[in-house]
Amino acid sequence: MVTDVQRKLVQSTFAAIVPIADDAAMLFYQRLFEIAPELRPMFRGDMTEQRKMLMQMLTAAVKGLDRLEQLVPVVEDLGRRHAGYGVEDRHYDTVGEALLWTLEMGLGAAFTADVKDAWATVYGVLATTMKNAARDVLVPVLR
């Protein structure tokens, strides 16, 4: 569960990332493909557009932490769509690792242990929500 302190830490530190959003997204994908080159073929389209979509999704998620009842259905839909792209449960851990690394690079000294824990918690909740929604799509296919 995400505490109010964690929610506020994520929102305040994300505000510091917004001015460098394109660079942060570029760093994220560079790191993702560095630690998991097998994921590169999943991204066939324009990476400029992909970076923009990543930051739009992160912005919506961070803002949505104030309105979880509205955020959860959006995140579930995202999880179902990602299942169709071939995303597997194990990929979420890799994405989380790349995200935390990117935040550390972007925030520098502001990326404290508490900030890291807050982001890891929020990402964990979002990733679990996406994985559960993806299973709802995949399970009927496997039966």
Question: Where is each model-derived feature located?
Answer:
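Globin-like tetrapyrrole-binding proteins
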Residues: 1-143
